[in-house]
Each structure stands twice: as C-alpha cells, then as structure tokens.
C-alpha cells in the first residue's frame, strides 16, 4: 500500500498551507485534486488575506490589538453564532502562520495602504492594517506545472490572458491622464506580448493565481506529490482514527495510507446538490466556485458521524454576478466586487425600476439585499456615458475599448435615452425616469439621503477619490445610457464541518475525529455567514491550514504511536 504522512484533499490556499507546513515539519505529503487543474477557488480569487497584527502592519505602524478585532467580529457575527475558541485561535495564530509561510517563501504579501473593514463604523473596525495584498509572482517558476494551474475566467483577464491587480487596474483607468500610469501599462503590455510567444497566457501572475502558484512552487520543491483527476471515494478508519483514503484514478481504485492525518480542503459545496438546499430561492443564481466544489468533504465526513455547522440565514459568501452567454452556449460569469458598483454615475435598480440598496456597500451586503425581496433579483446596474468611459461596467471595459460585441451578445444594453433603456430592460419608463431624477438631484450635491452611498470610509475607498464632493455619487446625465443584468451569486460556502481550534473535525458529540482535519471552505466558517472584511476566507484558510499541519506533526501516529 502506498503511504504518506499527510494526505490533503483539495488544492486551494488552505490545503497548500497545510501541505507546505507539513513538508517543513518533515512530513511526507500527497495532495489529491479532483479537477484537471489545481488551485480551486483560491486561484481565481482576489487573493487578499485578512489577518490581525501582521509583520507588514507593524512595519507600517498599524499593529492591531487583539481585543479590537474580537470586538469587531463579535459585533458583526453576533453573540449567538460567535465561536470564541475559533476566533481566539485565528487572532492568536494568524500572524504566526503568515510569518512562517513567508519565511519558507510560500507566500508574499504587502499591506494595503487603504482597505477599510466592510462595516467601518462598527466598534473595533479599522481603515488600514488587516487586509494584505498578494505580491505578483512569475508563473515561469512553476516550470511544466504552470499549465496545470487553474486560470482565472476570461472576463478577469485582459487581452485574452493578462492578469492585473488592483494597482494595475487603477493605472489602466488613469493612463489617458497620467504619464506614470501610461508607462506602467506599457511595461505590462510588453511583458505580456513576450509571454505569449511561448505561453498560452501571461506569466506575470496576480491576486489568487499568484498566491497559489507561489505556494505550489514551494510545496513541490519541498517534496510534495500532487495528483490531478483523482476522485476520493471514502475515508479509511481504523480504531477510531482516519488512516487513509480510497480513491479512483484513471478508472482504477486504490487505497492510500495517511500515517498522520487527512486534511479536507475540497472547497465546500457551492457547486453541488447541497447548494440548492441551503440557498434562498431566487430566479437564477450563479456561483463563482469551480464545478469540483461539490461537497465531497461533507459526503466523506458524514460517514464518520461528523458534525456540520448550523443552517444559518446565510450559508454562503454572496456576490452579484453578471453573465455573458456566448453563441456556442458557453457562459462567462463576472463577479461585481470592486470595479463598478461604487463608482460615481452608477446605480442599481430592481424590477420596479427602484433603487433598493447602497451600491457601494460590500458585494456580500449588496447580494444579500437582492435576496431580501423577490423584485430585487435579478436587478440592473445602470450608468451614463461618462461613467462607462471612465470605469466600464462588468465585462464592458472603459475607453478606449470597443464593447459592441457585448451589446450584440445581449450582455450590455445601450440606449440614447432612459426611456429606451427601460424598454430594453422591461422596466416602467416613468418609474425609471423618476428614480434617476431623484438620485441625480442629490448626487449633484454629493449626497444620497435615500441609501447613503458614499457614506462611510469603505464606500469611498471603493469609489473614485478624484471625484468630489463624494467619491461615489455623480448624476447620470450624458447619453447614451448603459445597463447590465445582475443575478445573485456566491464566492463559496460559509457553512462547513465543525472543527476544533486546531482544525480537527468534530463528531456529533463534539469530540475530535482523530486524524481528520478540515480547512478553507470545508471548515465551518467562524464568520457564520457574515463578511466583515476583504480576505476573511483566505486569512482563516492559511491560518488553520498551518495549525492543522502543526497539530499533526505533534501527534503520535495511529499506526506506531510515535511522534513523527
């Protein structure tokens, strides 16, 4: 029987954190991925992490008190769903985990100069100090494994294969007005042109792709084995401990031994049958999770009487999503996170042609509002010609890009008047005119008394700081007018397997199942269906991935009784 010390099921950030840490502790590691490419949701994410009091924050004079972040989390999560053991472990070990992974070269982050928590006016919130940005990475370091790295969706790439980060996006928006930005963009384009001579896409990686590529490079160099296209059929249990897995690969079934433990890091159930059961019913819903995130960990762990998290009012991390339907039947999904909703000259209206939410609040808040009333989903994001020229709208890029193909495909609507736009969208023209007129009167003064768009530091950070008197508000005046349809969507699941502070999966009696761990979206999120800030999934994923491997390295193996 083939054997390793640790078997990791899944290849996202949490799984790689466990794998790298285990390798560094002298343990042998096998990573199993169901898909033909590795990286999971993490590889197509923004890659940011939300961790308190990191070395990066301390260097910039932004050290964070543990009491402050705990107060903030308890306020947002609520007393009933707040788990002090898990929160304490995250707060106490987040900095340690990140520093360890950085020391080993597995991650590299910088402090975002301005990245407010999503509820900046609540007790314990900060405008800077917790959110970290992934430093770009050269994908060529992966060698032949670069082709196995999951690529972001086409809509998140420029020119068919170039990745950009938040800073790059700002430079592209400014390049017609700034020589510095023009120079920055020219260098990116030159690098990309060179890459395409020998690679299927750009090798300058950003965001979640940079995170996973860097972690994979280090893990593989430290001896981790990575298998793709593997289906895990069941867990092997011996004398009350998980000691291996039964798999199917290339039509052959095999049993593999895990001497120290198995880590479930398979990405949750956002793409599986469980999703419909735990999701509010809306007309259409689109997940950004890969198809392989089908709840495999739940199926595997349920056979061992594992405890699942409570069914909350929100079991997902929500986001509004637009969908481009290609002529060949393909669907291209775009999550509306930071590029358009908060910008001046952009509003959202529901089926009654009425605004229903502060458009510049977080994507989780926005999509939650879409689900609050039947008429709010799907909804429409609307802007005027000036906003389109400056910021774009979803997959529609700002000037000088030609977006006619998106209009022909029915993704982007364009009309020379609001009345004609309403007709295209199936809205009441008089109601839409009244909504826009009301918004315009207030926006001209930089105000939004109806929904307070631009009313807090997070809103303004997502807007356009050059636009005054408010970074988020400007009247919609200049024709043509544009619109796209937004559907409810998600970035992954919040509900998962209940664990200990060391990421051990607990059984129904709330006792650890020896040798079984869960991290990432397979772990019941301590956020309990809330979304306090940027990177609140990946921060805990790295932390508890690290803690799971550290715990395994300290335990006697079930087979020998000796500490590895």
Give a label for each model feature.
Residues 1-6, 24, 213, 531, ...:
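Extreme N-terminal leader/targeting segments of oxidoreductases
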Residues 6-31:
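N-terminal Rossmann-like FAD-binding beta1-loop-alpha1 element of flavoenzymes
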Residues 10, 248, 258-259, 264-266, ...:
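Short, well-ordered coil/turn residues at beta-beta hairpins
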Residues 34-225, 346-348, 355, 386-388, ...:
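Conserved N-terminal/central alpha/beta ligand/cofactor-binding core
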Residues 120, 128, 135-184, 298-302, ...:
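An anion/pyrophosphate-binding glycine-rich loop and adjacent beta-alpha core
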Residues 202-209, 221, 249-327, 538, ...:
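Glycine-rich loop(s) and the adjacent beta-strand/alpha-helix scaffold that form part
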Residues 234, 238-242, 431-526, 530:
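A glycine-rich dinucleotide-binding beta-alpha-beta segment and adjacent secondary-structure elements
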Residues 300-307, 433, 540-559:
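Internal hydrophobic alpha-helix adjacent to the cofactor/substrate pocket in enzyme cavities
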């Amino acid at each position: 029987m083939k054997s390793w010390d640790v078997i990791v099921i899944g290849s996202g950030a949490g799984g790689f954190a466990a794998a790298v840490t285990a390798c560094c502790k002298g343990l042998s590691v096998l990573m199993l991925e169901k898909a033909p490419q590795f990286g999971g949701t993490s590889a197509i994410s923004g890659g940011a992490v939300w961790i308190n009091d990191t070395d990066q924050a301390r260097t910039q004079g932004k050290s964070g008190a543990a009491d402050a972040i705990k107060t903030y989390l308890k306020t947002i999560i609520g007393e009933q769903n707040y788990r002090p053991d898990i929160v304490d472990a995250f707060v106490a070990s987040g900095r340690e985990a990140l520093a360890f992974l950085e020391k080993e070269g597995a991650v590299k982050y910088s402090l975002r100069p301005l990245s407010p928590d999503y509820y900046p006016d609540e007790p314990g919130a900060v405008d800077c100090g917790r959110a970290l940005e992934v430093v770009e990475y050269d994908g060529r370091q992966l060698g032949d494994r670069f082709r196995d790295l999951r690529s972001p969706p086409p809509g998140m790439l420029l020119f068919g294969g170039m990745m950009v980060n938040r800073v790059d996006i700002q430079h592209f928006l400014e390049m017609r007005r700034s020589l510095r930005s023009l120079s920055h963009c020219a260098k990116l384009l030159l690098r990309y042109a060179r890459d395409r001579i020998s690679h299927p896409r750009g090798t300058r990686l950003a965001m979640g792709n940079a995170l996973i590529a860097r972690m994979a490079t280090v893990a593989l160099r430290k001896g981790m084995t990575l298998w793709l296209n593997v289906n895990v059929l069941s867990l092997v249990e011996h004398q009350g401990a998980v000691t291996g897995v039964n798999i199917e690969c290339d039509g052959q079934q095999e049993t593999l031994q895990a001497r120290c433990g198995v880590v479930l890091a398979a990405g949750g159930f956002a793409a599986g049958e469980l999703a419909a059961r735990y999701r509010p019913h809306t007309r259409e819903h689109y997940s950004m999770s890969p198809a392989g995130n089908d709840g495999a960990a739940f199926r595997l762990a349920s056979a061992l009487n594992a405890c699942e998290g409570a069914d909350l009012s929100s079991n997902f991390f929500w986001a509004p999503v637009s969908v481009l339907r290609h002529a060949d039947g393909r669907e291209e999904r775009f999550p509306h996170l930071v590029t358009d909703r908060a910008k001046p000259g952009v509003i959202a209206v529901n089926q009654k042609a009425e605004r229903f939410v502060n458009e510049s609040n977080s994507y989780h808040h926005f999509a939650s509002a879409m689900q609050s009333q039947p008429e709010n989903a799907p909804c429409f994001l609307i802007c005027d010609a000036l906003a389109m020229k400056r910021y774009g709208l979803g997959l529609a890029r700002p000037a000088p890009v030609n977006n006619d193909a998106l209009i022909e495909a029915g993704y982007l609507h364009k009309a020379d008047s609001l009345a004609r736009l309403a007709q295209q969208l199936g809205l009441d023209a008089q109601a839409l005119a009244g909504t826009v007129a009301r918004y315009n009167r207030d926006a001209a003064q930089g105000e939004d008394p109806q929904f307070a768009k631009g009313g807090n530091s997070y809103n303004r950070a997502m807007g356009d700081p050059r636009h005054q008197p408010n970074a988020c508000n400007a009247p919609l005046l200049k024709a043509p007018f544009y619109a796209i349809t937004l559907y409810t969507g998600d970035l992954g699941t919040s509900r998962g397997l209940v664990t200990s502070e060391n990421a051990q999966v607990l059984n129904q009696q709330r006792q650890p199942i020896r040798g079984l761990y869960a991290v990432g979206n397979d772990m019941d999120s301590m956020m309990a269906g809330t979304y306090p800030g940027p990177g609140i999934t990946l921060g805990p994923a790295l932390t508890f991935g690290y803690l799971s491997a550290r715990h395994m390295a300290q335990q006697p193996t079930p087979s020998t009784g000796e500490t590895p």
